[in-house]
UniProtKB/Swiss-Prot annotation:
Name of the protein this chain belongs to: WD repeat-containing protein 48 homolog
SMART domains (UniProt xref): WD40
Compositionally biased tracts (Low complexity): 338-348, 626-635
Family the entry assigns: Belongs to the WD repeat WDR48 family.
A Pfam cross-reference name: WD40
Ranges of biased composition (kind: Gly residues): 613-625
Native species: Culex quinquefasciatus
Superkingdom of this protein's organism: Eukaryota
Chain segments annotated as coiled-coil in the UniProt record: none
Disulfide partners: none
Molecular function (Gene Ontology), one example: ubiquitin binding
Subunit architecture: Catalytic component of the Usp12-46 deubiquitylase complex consisting of Usp12-46, Wdr20 and Uaf1; regulatory subunit that, together wtih Wdr20, stabilizes Usp12-46. The Usp12-46 deubiquitylase complex associates with arr/arrow; the interaction leads to deubiquitination and stabilization of arr/arrow.
Region (Disordered): 321-348, 613-645
GO biological process, one term: double-strand break repair via homologous recombination
Amino acid sequence: MVSFVIRDAEEKRHRNGVNALQLDPVNGRLYSAGRDAIIRVWNSTQTSSQEPYIQSMEHHNDWVNDIVLCCGGRNLISASCDTTVKVWNAHKGFCMSTLRTHRDYVQALAYAKDREQVASAGLDKAIFLWDVNTLTALTASNNTVTTSSITGSKDSIYSLAMNPSGTIIVSGSTENTLRIWDPRTCNKIAKLKGHTENVKALVVSEDGTQVVSGSSDGKIKLWSIGQQRCIQTISVHSEGVWALLMTDNFSHVISGSRDKKIVMTELRNPTNSVLICEERAPVLSLCYNIDQTGIWATTWNSDVRCWKLNKTDKLSNYSYSSNSSINSGGGGDGTPVTNSASNATPASAGKGYEVACIKGGAAIKKYHVLNDKRFMLTKDSEQNVAIYDVLKVKKVEDLGKVDYEEEIKKRSQRVHVPNWFTVDLKTGMPTIVLGQDEVDCFAAWVSAEAGLPEHAESGSDPKVNYGSLLLQALLEYWKPPPPHHHLQGGVPDMENGCDGDIRGNEYFIVPKHTPIIFSEVGGRNVCRLLVKDAAGETESALLSETVPSWVTNVVIERTIPKFIKLPFYLLAHPSMLKQDRSKKERLIANEFIQCRKVCEHVLEKVLGADLPGGGGGSSTGGGGNSNSSQNNSQSDANSEGSQVPAEERIELLCNDVNNEDYGKNIHLNT
């Protein structure tokens, strides 16, 4: 499959939920892993008047589920639904290498700081251990890496944790259990049962003797690894617990939940708990700010917020339950907040105290492909409607907060063009998928006059294939090595542009910043690059290895996709009393032929009339039973109306619907 994303050249704002956070306390950089497939880097110490955005790290093509900073903040490891683990230069923001060991979504990472070891796990039930120093030393020539694997998990893994010394690794899964291994030997230590739903979050104590778990069952549990049992159950949430953060001494847990609430609780005395804040959406991840006076939180929404943190020695003043709410007159430490006493900004009553907010962008939630199969309307999470040109890979117009359904009705045409692409909104940006299986990307043949009116030349009406034109535009900068076939005499075969000099198409170009993704039918990512990067030597060689033949046929060999033929019958309407209504004329034509061509056929071949412009008529009409009076009337019509277009002289009906109702450029398939 080939897919591409319609987006801006630089996307400075998350366009969907944010799955994970990492803070570099040395330089104050905050890393956020987005469901829009982009990792962004922010200055977490910015003031409200400064732009927090630093850069984007782009190489994934699906949700980034987890990230870990390692090597003192020099490198970052990421895990994604595109089934890959990637190694990044965190400071410069480029991808150093890609690990393709997993066979399904990679959901979680764990990091042993003292050993510089990272573990990855996901829906394929596998856990792989990676030596970070080995990963960061990989090059184009030195690209072989060995890994240890931990087996035994019977279900998909959603959470993973290690202690800094790397003596314990814990996984949580849809088995509703915690499995514990020694990563040094890959031997199983224990299996802990107690949760009733998926285990979504884990934290291991520094000494490796305890682990805290959060589950979709809404419970937080403290486990003793030595005793292999649960020693505390905390119930402060009404829905699943998806994020956990521990204080340095492992005495208090900060939990984020599907119920949108973030709560701090003392592990040994759960009655000492306080509601830090209530977010706008279910909480996905948590991390401390640079001085640990607040916590950064992410949710299903695209904003990243920092909330004022309570002091642990004041927790005994509170007793929070899932039905409690914040006293809107007090700060996070139990004292009143005024503008002179704190920089924190009170949010709406009962919602907590927001210290900072990194604003996100809107995610596209709805789309409708118009009947012309070129344009589509979208509606985003802020209720804004926009129109996109899929063929030219760009947004055409922001329509604002208008009636979405009315815009669809207003812009729909009575025309039929076959489906030739599918749309995926998983990342919050429109991803267009071209393939050869369920939806054939070469199915849409149209006349240039109807499909590309802005490029059609007067007097000519060539037929164009949308999928072919788009693939040629997407790979315009790719110049693969020349083929090894030659004509007799040693002269290179230049036919069909095989020398690579003929690239792109004659009608349009697409934005150079457009990401193109080549993937297997099952969705596994094979190659990702920008349109402009296809000219690079490395990228060109990679494309030569990965681009499927059905793409190279139209892009390089310039093979024309086959026309789709449509059989149909012509039958005289009952109102034509003198016409032989029992006789049908069976015809076959390309499905994209315009119905005015059928009118011309009827006028010339069936009725024997002249075409506009002096074209001679046939003396034997397709009707076959014309009598002399009919011929006389046709002769009169010829002399008086030979300059009138055929579609104005012939009325075509299909299922009793007049073709005039659809416009003069209606196609036969419509």
